[in-house]
């Protein structure tokens, strides 16, 4: 069966063998639709200096699918966490002298290196001594994808190039949910009226590092007897203010999006959100809500799908940024013969802490219903009945018996949603999930 998987990057990577076995292995197509709004980690530095869509989740999925082990090592490689060592290693990779190139054939090496050099040239054009690019923990795959996108002028083309170089199966497709060369950010509107802006800030915010502004607040007058360090600090402050508009993110963007999200801990869930999430929305640089359209390639794949899987991962920041795209939500709604399977996470995270299974599902249904209503309104389509049935969006739920998020099957049975329990593991395993999805695919 043709399968479409909507997901983020990291969590679903462990399930890729399952999805391949139920589709590619049987001669059918497998499509991954991924978000482009993750502004955390090394991606945040690329967004800050170069701009463009966030490609961390896309790179993570492609690396998982590559058949060339040498390119898996290259595109999955991260620079050291030390500032000086990271810059040194990056220069060696650009120059072609780094050991990571050793086992890669010369023609593939020069093909990959050309786009990495293109990325280096872009960084050099935008270098500012007051706030330079931070290379710590940067992903070489992210650099390659961004360099290819800048050269080719297309995110879709850069993804296709990376997959073909790495000898991915022609039956597997990795598609960004929005086809764009621009940055897209999301915000979370909480039930208490508070707004949190930026995917990383919602799910795993970096610990802020206060900046010393003691000199900046003083008069900008250099005494002849003043120290050289003070003089230099003031000059750098002036340079940073004057150069700010030259960065990829415009000067009028929301202040919270100008902070680096380079250093964060995905496992740090010590602080929950101040209130539950009411809804997720896309915003423009002024903080106003926008409603972008889903990638036409993604729409086409959903129309041909026998099964759409809402995979595990962050509900609010990985799954919903895909499902709130109005045209994508509508084509899922209209796919009457398609199985629509929701995989429930095995544990809570910061975004959904305290939600039971009912409210977890309702968040998806309400978000997609709202997106469809907005999309139809924008097209001037009058709809007398926007009160959709639950099974129009979700036909099956797969959950873990020992998972933290409780599922009351009787509630969902009333809405004609079938529930499938996995009792043999504490986390979603590829082999067990494969059995369940095959059974779902056989049902009428």
Swiss-Prot record:
InterPro entries xref list: CofD, CofD-like_dom_sf
Domain of life (superkingdom): Eukaryota
CDD domains: YvcK_like
Paired cysteines (S-S): none
Miscellaneous comment in the UniProt entry for this protein: Present with 1100 molecules/cell in log phase SD medium.
Record GO terms (molecular function): LPPG:FO 2-phospho-L-lactate transferase activity
PANTHER family: MATERNAL EFFECT EMBRYO ARREST 18
Protein name, per record: Uncharacterized protein YNL011C
Organism: Saccharomyces cerevisiae (strain ATCC 204508 / S288c)
């Amino acid at each position: 069966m043709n399968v479409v998987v909507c997901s983020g990057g990291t969590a679903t990577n462990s399930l890729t063998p399952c999805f391949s076995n139920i589709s590619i292995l049987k001669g059918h197509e497998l499509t991954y639709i991924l978000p482009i709004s993750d502004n955390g980690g090394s991606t945040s530095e690329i967004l800050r200096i170069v701009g463009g869509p966030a490609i961390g989740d896309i790179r993570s999925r492609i690396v998982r699918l590559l058949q060339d082990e040498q390119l898996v090592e290259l595109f999955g490689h991260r620079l050291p966490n030390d500032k000086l060592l990271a810059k040194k290693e990056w220069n060696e990779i650009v120059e072609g002298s780094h050991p990571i190139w050793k086992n890669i054939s010369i023609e593939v090496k020069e093909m990959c290196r050309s786009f990495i050099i293109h990325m280096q040239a872009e960084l050099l054009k935008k270098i500012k001594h007051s706030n330079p690019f931070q290379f710590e923990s940067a992903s070489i795959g992210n650099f390659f994808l961004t360099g290819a996108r800048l050269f080719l002028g297309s995110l879709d083309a850069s993804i296709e190039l990376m997959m073909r170089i790495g000898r991915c199966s022609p039956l597997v497709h990795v598609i960004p949910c929005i086809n764009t060369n621009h940055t897209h950010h999301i915000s979370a509107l909480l039930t208490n009226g508070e707004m949190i802006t930026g995917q990383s800030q919602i799910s795993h915010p970096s610990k802020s590092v206060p900046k010393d502004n003691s000199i900046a607040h003083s008069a900008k007058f250099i005494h002849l007897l003043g120290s050289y360090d003070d003089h230099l600090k003031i000059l750098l402050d002036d340079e940073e203010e004057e150069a700010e508009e030259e960065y990829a993110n415009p000067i009028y963007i929301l202040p919270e999006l100008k902070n680096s999200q380079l250093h964060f801990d995905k496992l740090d869930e010590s602080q929950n959100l101040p209130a539950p999430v009411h809804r997720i929305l896309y915003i423009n640089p002024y903080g106003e809500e926008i409603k972008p359209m889903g990638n036409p390639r993604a729409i086409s794949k959903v129309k041909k799908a026998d099964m759409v899987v809402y995979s595990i991962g962050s509900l609010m920041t990985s799954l919903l940024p895909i499902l709130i795209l109005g045209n994508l939500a509508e084509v899922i709604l209209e796919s009457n013969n398609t199985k629509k399977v929701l995989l429930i996470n095995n544990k809570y995270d910061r975004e959904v802490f305290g939600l039971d299974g009912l409210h977890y599902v309702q968040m998806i249904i309400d978000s997609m219903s709202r997106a469809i209503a907005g999309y139809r309104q924008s097209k001037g389509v009058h709809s007398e009945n926007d009160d959709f049935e639950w099974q129009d969006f979700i036909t099956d739920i797969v959950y873990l018996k020992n998972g933290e998020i409780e599922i009351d099957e009787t509630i969902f049975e009333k809405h004609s949603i079938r529930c499938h329990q996995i009792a043999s593991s504490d986390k979603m395993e590829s082999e067990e999930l494969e059995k369940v999805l095959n059974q779902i695919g056989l049902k009428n």
